Amino acid sequence: MWTCPWCGRTFAARNQTHTCASLGDLEAHFARSETSVREAYDAALSVVRALGPVEVLAEKSRIAWHVRMSFAAFQPRASWLDGHLVLAREIPSARWRRVEVFSARNVLHAFRLRGRADIDDEFAAWLAEAYDVGCQRHLGR
């Protein structure tokens, strides 16, 4: 693991390209959101925290989750939570708003959550797969 000497963030790759920006306030991301939006976020985070440590990065325009690499990001809206998971494979599902294949083991799956009920067993399994990507287990690390 490499730690940026300027901002203190950790990355799997030495000299990882990133923006050294101070992190924002997590609560500010939800200031204009309905309670159900925060409940969906908290339910998803609870699933991931049960898997192991995760760094929550409240950036200027999004909230990112990071272990060795970022594996999920969220943008709270007034009535829903937009986000994406990075998975090591393409998973067909009507629940995805879009899927972008960057490489064979780097596939972005965009979603929209409206409440805690959206964090069901299926979504929890996808969170676990994304967490493994964040740990780089899909690369044998």
PLM region descriptions:
Residues 1-141:
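Charge-dense, helix-prone N-terminal extensions
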